[in-house]
Amino acid sequence: FQKWVAISITGVDYSSRKEKYVSNEDINIIKEELLPGDILLKRNNYQLTNMGLPGFWTHTGIYIGCLEKLDKYFNDIPLGDCLCVSEYVKVIYPKVYDRLCNESDGEYIIEVIAPGVVINSLDAIAKVDYFSALRPKLPKEDKLKALFTAFESLGKAYDYNFDIMTDNVLFCSELIYKSYLCSRNKKGLTFDLEAKAGRLLLSPNNIIKKFDAEFYSENSEFDFVIFYDEDRKS
């Protein structure tokens, strides 16, 4: 039943506006500011799904960019016999590579929506009413490992039970959590999980709350990148 309700209300929008606050011109500016591995957050007003989500921010994803941008940003990261990231992705993650080769979509994100873990154009998360981007304060090598972890989840189904302890299905902020999870060979991000309905949960809003709580701390794990809303673009 929970899955049926979630699918039924996804995309239901009661706004009278045809266009979102973030315009195509804004997105062109946003593209210039983003770097691979950035964490993106969005909100649309008057969407029915907002009622069931805690806090202001309702969705999150990870910015990939394009093959050229990946190669340029991670050009100093050794990848065995592969000369660049795009070559490595072609060998290890061929489905990801094929999707990124579709130049008509420009730049890409990886996110979890109703069909599951997908690679979509940047517009899917940026052409909205409110958009923000945060940059993990991590070495490039660890950001690349986080992206590779996300790529490994491509095609997994959506987790309608919002159970962060399962790995075979994911929800949007769970992709962020597990992609940037610390391991023996990877520095990562630390998130405080919140208990909801007997489960541990990380919501998109929790990510922003973490950024806000740590903003003036020497141990802050995010840099601010960009924020757009109806009144202010900064």
Locate each region found by the language model:
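Cysteine-nucleophile amide-bond enzymes
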Residues: 1-234
